[in-house]
């Protein structure tokens, strides 16, 4: 694993995320393809999401093809991975006392619609 990959997904983050990743089922096709490492896929997705890089320009250095990365992103999104990961990170930071909830901001807006108007 190269330096960029370790900066994007440090071992501590991967330890939190790995148990949350849904099981992978191979696609039925002739000959099949070699399974791709979940950490490599996760790292490629993090790169796309944090860099603003378009999916189609995902560097091959991650060892993941664009279709594989996007397919897993879609599957993991439908499975609720990102919400569960966010909660796991908050739980871990909270357990370490690294979140100062006294400075949290809650924002909400409510505007009453006039009767008969959209």
How would you name each of these model-derived features?
Residues 1-118:
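Short alpha-helical elements
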């Amino acid at each position: 694993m190269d330096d960029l990959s370790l900066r994007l997904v440090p071992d501590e983050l991967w330890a939190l995320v790995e148990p949350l990743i849904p099981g992978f089922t191979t696609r039925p096709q002739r000959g099949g393809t070699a399974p791709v490492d979940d950490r490599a896929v996760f790292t490629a997705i993090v790169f796309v999401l944090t860099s603003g890089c378009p999916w189609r320009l995902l560097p091959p250095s991650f060892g993941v093809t664009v279709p594989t990365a996007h397919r897993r992103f879609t599957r993991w999104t439908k499975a609720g991975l990102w919400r569960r990961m966010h909660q796991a990170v908050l739980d871990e930071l909270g357990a370490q006392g690294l979140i100062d909830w006294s400075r949290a901001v809650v924002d909400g807006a409510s505007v009453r619609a006039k009767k008969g108007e959209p």
